């Protein structure tokens, strides 16, 4: 390597020397005489004698004789390389300078050429445009000149007509400046109203399936008045309310104002509505609030009533008033939910009801608008009163909200308030053509003037006492801030001081906090309800909270979340997961166990019942053949083995219908249930779970809980066996609320599609379901077989989750059972209920009369009953039922569908817990859980859909009992996995219909056995005796048509129960 480097260096030096001449090395500094030459053949260097400098070239001052420079061969390589490097740098610099100079000259010449060409091209282009443009004008001028020269008279006439037309137009515009706008906008307004307003809503009508009542009753404080046309015919209604500014005002629907006259039934006076001034008016919300001329309240004989604004309206019963033959009638209604910016109301109305108010006790909730046409909505809608600070709402902050929650979400309330604020500002800026409004004029009320003068000249001492009394008045817990409540300012900017001011509503605020005003029942300001959420979190809208309040709220939230986290860890610790030895029922596997918390006992016949049977042999004959089932884990496992085996046997032979068949049945079911379209839960209206909306949903869910029901697994571990222990504890209720919210949050985020039953529980998406034998009498044949009726009890948190997701739909089905195939809401306790049900059946079946239906029911309907229906429900049936529910949700969201899908996954893939703590995971999805919140609703709809799959034109069901069209193919039920039996008589819900008013219970003997062997009134406990007597009279009511049997039972059961001294 070193040798190669040396050779390369020598070759490089040789190349430099051989190219010295060509490289320009003949520089004067190196032009020595006698320069040496190199011999390529020998490689030796030879040098001539050292050249001598000329003597005249040396400086004259130097007298010393200089020595000639040594030859190049005597110099060192370093000096030679230095010289070569310097020579190369100078030559490169010279070449670079010459190159740059030539390149610059070339670029400059090119730039001058391009610039000259560009300027010449631009000049040519511009002159071309000028020539073309000028040519066009010149041509046009020549044509016009030729036209005028050829048609002189015609052109003159056209010019004169154009001038005359222009003068006429300017004159008409000066005479009526707004006439063109009016002529242009009027048709557009008519087209807009016809195309949009009347398309979405129409006249009032009766809600299909809703049965209300009407009684003669006057409106509260005579606050409802009639609106008439100019000719005296009926138009609508208006309602008098007391504003927070101290004035009275009328509230009515905006579409009722045109040409209306406010008419008093008492005095007969009429006041044109055009004399009322609107302080709030919204065509979109169809509501107007108007204040009237002086003394209008006295002329109409009305008083201002209290009202409730949109942000505080809750679900519950209501009423409205109408005039019928000159008499006021009160009609029932139900506040159901939200519909866009309105409130959906279940009520039966008719044309001319617009503007009538809906009342909760003596509080106005809103006014009737009409009936929505979109989405086949089966309810009327109510226009609500927006919250306008100082006018319809006070400048006070309340600490708590309605017990059952609000109808509107926070976003909807804010939107209503924003629109109301803009409308008020718009009206405040309004000026009439005279630049003065009637409200700016002073009233000529002499009495009021004297009253005002007296108030002005009042002694200072008395005024000071009054002020002192007001200051020392005890403040209520609902008042956080008492801001100045200023009167409303009118268009001119002046305060209307001359108007008679009513009593300041301070006392009303105090009554509100005590539950005497505002929302009664479902609208009360319940301070005890603060446990459900943060106090003040749903407080009066539009008032900002202080930093201290925000800090307190955050502290409560942190405490609630921490408590829920601790409780979750506590409950998770009781599970011992893992496979266990021993056999298990088919379709299940043992996946773990928990400690034993339940110790059910087998019931036996009571001494009281045995004594009655000995004394009354006829009673013994009636109750023979029944007995109490066994209880405990062994009985549960035995019955589970039998029912699970039958379930899987039917499932193996069943086939799932095709996609087209399922789609057809789903669409037909949605059409049959179209009257039950409801809103999605408030908590899932956004893309993420909303805490504020959840608070409203959970309030309603908690209110509907059965307090004496069991809490289930794992909450029984805490030692409170019933719902009451959690709901009525103000410390545990916030924890329960947070636990429910956390579960919904996990359901919205988890990937649950491929999870097993135990994984769903381990991930916190659901709880195990407690399995136990129902404590009711069984037939002896079932007792001998060991096939007991099993109950699957869902936990408290899962109950609340299901109620939050489905309570709107289930409650709507109960309210409107007359217009939907599902009948969970009807009863047969009275003859009237029996006749009402048969009338519904007669209309659906097409029978000419109820009598004909009862006499020849086989021609019009077919009563069927499914054996073991809960165990026969396949998972695809639950999926189709959920699809129907989603399609019947008006404002459904992806989050709502996600939560419902998670709930369906959990309910179809459950972990059962026996009484001894054994956990059994379901390996085959399906089976309707009997203790679920949706069991009655979903079973009824699945039963109807099964009839549709079998070709029935119509069907109605109550759980597994059904009445369906005669054209139903019963053989198709086997392919669906159902075992169906056809009744010989007209039977439905364990009752046989003998005639239009007679429904005889089928299980009379079973009821008697449970009555005499389920109670022991001889114990002497007053509560036991009271419950026994209530059960006796309930059974006698069911058997009311068999008077002979009722008389005997009354003699056998009632006297003996009260003879014991206690």
From Swiss-Prot:
<dbReference type="GO" id="GO:0004252">
    <property type="term" value="F:serine-type endopeptidase activity"/>
</dbReference>
<dbReference type="InterPro" id="IPR043502">
    <property type="entry name" value="DNA/RNA_pol_sf"/>
</dbReference>
<dbReference type="InterPro" id="IPR009003">
    <property type="entry name" value="Peptidase_S1_PA"/>
</dbReference>
<keyword id="KW-0472">Membrane</keyword>
<feature type="active site" description="For protease activity">
    <location>
        <position position="286"/>
    </location>
</feature>
<keyword id="KW-0547">Nucleotide-binding</keyword>
<feature type="active site" description="For protease activity">
    <location>
        <position position="354"/>
    </location>
</feature>
<dbReference type="GO" id="GO:0006351">
    <property type="term" value="P:DNA-templated transcription"/>
</dbReference>
<dbReference type="InterPro" id="IPR018019">
    <property type="entry name" value="Luteovirus_Orf2"/>
</dbReference>
<feature type="compositionally biased region" description="Basic residues">
    <location>
        <begin position="497"/>
        <end position="511"/>
    </location>
</feature>
<feature type="transmembrane region" description="Helical">
    <location>
        <begin position="144"/>
        <end position="164"/>
    </location>
</feature>
<comment type="function">
    <text>Precursor from which the RNA-dependent RNA polymerase (RdRp) is probably released. RNA-dependent RNA polymerase plays an essential role in virus replication (Potential).</text>
</comment>
<dbReference type="InterPro" id="IPR000382">
    <property type="entry name" value="Peptidase_S39B_luteovirus"/>
</dbReference>
<keyword id="KW-0732">Signal</keyword>
<feature type="compositionally biased region" description="Basic and acidic residues">
    <location>
        <begin position="551"/>
        <end position="560"/>
    </location>
</feature>
<dbReference type="InterPro" id="IPR007094">
    <property type="entry name" value="RNA-dir_pol_PSvirus"/>
</dbReference>
<keyword id="KW-0693">Viral RNA replication</keyword>
<feature type="domain" description="RdRp catalytic">
    <location>
        <begin position="859"/>
        <end position="974"/>
    </location>
</feature>
<dbReference type="Pfam" id="PF02123">
    <property type="entry name" value="RdRP_4"/>
</dbReference>
<dbReference type="Pfam" id="PF02122">
    <property type="entry name" value="Peptidase_S39"/>
</dbReference>
<dbReference type="GO" id="GO:0003723">
    <property type="term" value="F:RNA binding"/>
</dbReference>
<keyword id="KW-0511">Multifunctional enzyme</keyword>
<keyword id="KW-0812">Transmembrane</keyword>
<feature type="domain" description="Peptidase S39">
    <location>
        <begin position="207"/>
        <end position="399"/>
    </location>
</feature>
<protein>
    <recommendedName>
        <fullName>Protein P1-P2</fullName>
        <ecNumber>3.4.21.-</ecNumber>
        <ecNumber>2.7.7.48</ecNumber>
    </recommendedName>
</protein>
<keyword id="KW-0808">Transferase</keyword>
<dbReference type="InterPro" id="IPR001795">
    <property type="entry name" value="RNA-dir_pol_luteovirus"/>
</dbReference>
<keyword id="KW-0378">Hydrolase</keyword>
<feature type="compositionally biased region" description="Polar residues">
    <location>
        <begin position="463"/>
        <end position="484"/>
    </location>
</feature>
<dbReference type="GO" id="GO:0070008">
    <property type="term" value="F:serine-type exopeptidase activity"/>
</dbReference>
<dbReference type="GO" id="GO:0000166">
    <property type="term" value="F:nucleotide binding"/>
</dbReference>
<dbReference type="GO" id="GO:0006508">
    <property type="term" value="P:proteolysis"/>
</dbReference>
<keyword id="KW-0645">Protease</keyword>
<keyword id="KW-0548">Nucleotidyltransferase</keyword>
<keyword id="KW-1133">Transmembrane helix</keyword>
<keyword id="KW-0720">Serine protease</keyword>
<feature type="site" description="Cleavage; by viral serine protease">
    <location>
        <begin position="204"/>
        <end position="205"/>
    </location>
</feature>
<keyword id="KW-0696">RNA-directed RNA polymerase</keyword>
<feature type="region of interest" description="Disordered">
    <location>
        <begin position="455"/>
        <end position="560"/>
    </location>
</feature>
<feature type="transmembrane region" description="Helical">
    <location>
        <begin position="121"/>
        <end position="141"/>
    </location>
</feature>
<dbReference type="GO" id="GO:0016020">
    <property type="term" value="C:membrane"/>
</dbReference>
<feature type="transmembrane region" description="Helical">
    <location>
        <begin position="172"/>
        <end position="192"/>
    </location>
</feature>
């Amino acid at each position: 390597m070193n040798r190669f480097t040396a050779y390369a260096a020598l070759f490089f030096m040789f190349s430099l020397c051989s190219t010295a001449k060509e490289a320009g090395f003949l520089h004067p500094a190196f032009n020595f005489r006698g320069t040496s030459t190199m011999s390529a053949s020998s490689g030796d260097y030879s040098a001539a004698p050292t050249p001598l400098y000329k003597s005249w070239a040396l400086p004259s001052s130097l007298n010393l004789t200089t020595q000639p420079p040594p030859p190049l061969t005597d110099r060192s390589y370093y000096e030679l390389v230095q010289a070569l490097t310097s020579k190369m740098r100078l030559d490169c610099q010279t070449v670079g300078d010459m190159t740059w100079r030539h390149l610059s000259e070339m670029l400059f010449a090119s730039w001058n050429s391009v610039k000259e060409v560009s300027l010449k091209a631009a000049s040519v282009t511009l002159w071309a445009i000028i020539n073309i443009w000028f040519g066009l004008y010149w041509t046009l001028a020549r044509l016009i000149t030729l036209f005028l020269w050829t048609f002189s008279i015609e052109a003159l006439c056209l010019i004169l007509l154009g001038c005359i037309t222009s003068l006429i137009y300017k004159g008409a515009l000066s005479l009526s400046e707004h006439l063109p706008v009016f002529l242009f906008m009027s048709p557009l307004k008519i087209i807009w109203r016809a195309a949009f307003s009347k398309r979405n809503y129409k006249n009032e009508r009766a809600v299909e399936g809703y049965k209300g009542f009407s009684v003669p009753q006057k409106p509260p404080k005579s606050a409802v008045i009639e609106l008439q046309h100019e000719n005296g015919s009926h138009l609508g209604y208006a309602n008098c309310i007391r504003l927070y500014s101290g004035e009275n005002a009328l509230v009515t629907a905006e579409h009722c104002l045109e040409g209306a006259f406010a008419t008093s039934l008492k005095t007969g006076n009429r006041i044109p509505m055009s004399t009322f001034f609107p302080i709030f008016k919204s065509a979109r919300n169809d509501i107007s609030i108007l204040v009237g001329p002086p003394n209008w309240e006295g002329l109409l004989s009305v008083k201002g009533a209290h009202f409730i604004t949109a942000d505080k309206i809750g679900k519950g019963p209501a009423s409205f008033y109408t005039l019928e033959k000159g008499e006021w009638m009160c009609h029932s209604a139900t506040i159901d939910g939200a519909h866009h910016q309105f409130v959906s109301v279940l009520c039966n109305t008719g044309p001319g009801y617009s503007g009538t108010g809906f009342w909760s006790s003596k509080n106005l909730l809103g006014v009737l608008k009409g009936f929505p046409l979109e989405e086949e909505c089966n309810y009327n809608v109510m226009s609500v009163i927006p919250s306008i600070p100082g006018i319809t709402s006070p400048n006070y902050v309340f600490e708590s909200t309605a017990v059952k929650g609000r109808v509107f979400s926070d976003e909807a309330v804010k939107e209503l308030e924003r629109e109301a604020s803009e409308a008020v500002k718009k009206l405040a800026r309004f000026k009439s053509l005279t630049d003065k409004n009637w409200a700016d004029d002073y009233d000529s009320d002499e009495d009021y003037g004297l009253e005002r003068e007296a108030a002005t000249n009042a002694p200072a001492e008395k005024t000071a006492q009054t002020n002192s009394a007001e200051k020392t008045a005890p403040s209520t817990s609902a008042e956080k801030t008492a801001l100045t409540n200023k009167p409303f300012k009118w268009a001119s900017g002046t305060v209307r001081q001359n108007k008679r001011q009513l009593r300041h509503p301070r006392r009303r605020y105090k009554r509100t906090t005590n539950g005497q005003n505002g929302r009664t029942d479902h609208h009360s300001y319940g301070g005890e309800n603060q446990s459900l959420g943060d106090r003040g979190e749903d407080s009066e809208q539009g008032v900002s909270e202080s930093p201290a309040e925000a800090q307190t709220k955050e502290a409560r939230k942190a405490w609630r979340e921490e408590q829920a986290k601790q409780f979750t860890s506590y409950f998770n610790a009781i599970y011992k997961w893992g496979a266990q030895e021993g056999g298990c029922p088919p379709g299940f596997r043992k996946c773990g166990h928990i400690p034993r918390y339940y110790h059910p006992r087998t019931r036996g016949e009571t001494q009281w019942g045995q004594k009655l049977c000995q004394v009354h042999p006829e009673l013994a004959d009636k109750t023979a053949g029944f007995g109490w089932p066994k209880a405990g884990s062994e009985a549960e496992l035995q019955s589970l083995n039998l029912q699970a085996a039958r379930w899987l046997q039917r499932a193996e032979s069943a086939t799932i219908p095709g996609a087209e068949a399922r789609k057809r049945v789903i669409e037909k079911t949605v059409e049959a249930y179209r009257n039950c379209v409801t809103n999605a839960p408030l908590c899932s209206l956004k893309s993420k779970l909303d805490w504020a909306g959840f608070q409203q949903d959970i309030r309603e869910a908690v209110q509907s809980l059965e307090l004496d029901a069991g809490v289930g697994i794992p909450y029984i571990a805490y030692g409170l066996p019933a719902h009451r222990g959690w709901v009525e504890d103000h410390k545990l209720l916030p924890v329960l609320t947070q636990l429910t919210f956390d579960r919904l949050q996990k359901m919205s985020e988890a990937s649950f599609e491929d999870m097993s039953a135990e994984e769903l529980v381990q991930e916190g998406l659901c709880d195990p379901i407690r399995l136990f034998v129902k404590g009711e009498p069984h037939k002896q044949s079932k007792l001998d077989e060991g096939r007991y009726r099993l109950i699957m009890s869902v936990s408290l948190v899962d109950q609340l989750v299901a109620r939050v997701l489905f309570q709107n739909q289930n409650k709507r089905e109960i309210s409107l059972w007359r217009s939907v195939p599902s009948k969970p809401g009807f009863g047969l306790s009275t003859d009237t209920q029996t006749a009402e049900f048969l009338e519904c059946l007669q209309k659906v079946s097409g029978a000419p009369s109820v009598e004909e239906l009862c006499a020849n029911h086989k021609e019009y309907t077919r009563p069927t009953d499914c054996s073991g229906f809960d165990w026969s429900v396949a998972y695809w049936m639950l999926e189709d039922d959920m699809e129907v529910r989603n399609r019947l949700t008006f404002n459904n969201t992806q989050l709502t569908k996600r939560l419902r899908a998670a709930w369906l996954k959990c309910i179809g893939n459950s972990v059962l817990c026996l009484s001894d703590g054994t956990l059994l995971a379901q390996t085959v999805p399906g089976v309707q859980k009997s203790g679920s919140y949706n069991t009655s609703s979903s079973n009824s709809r699945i039963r109807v859909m099964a009839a549709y799959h079998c070709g029935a034109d119509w069907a109605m069901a109550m759980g597994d009992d059904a009445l369906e069209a005669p054209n139903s193919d019963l053989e198709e039920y086997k392919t669906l996995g159902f075992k169906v039996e056809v009744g010989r008589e007209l039977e439905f819900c364990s009752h046989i219909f003998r005639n239009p008013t007679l429904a005889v219970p089928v299980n009379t003997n079973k009821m008697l056995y449970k009555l005499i062997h389920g109670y022991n009134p001889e114990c002497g406990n007053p509560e036991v005796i009271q419950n026994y007597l209530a059960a006796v009279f309930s059974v006698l009511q069911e058997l009311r048509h068999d008077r002979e049997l009722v008389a005997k039972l009354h003699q056998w059961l009632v006297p003996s129960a009260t003879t014991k001294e206690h």
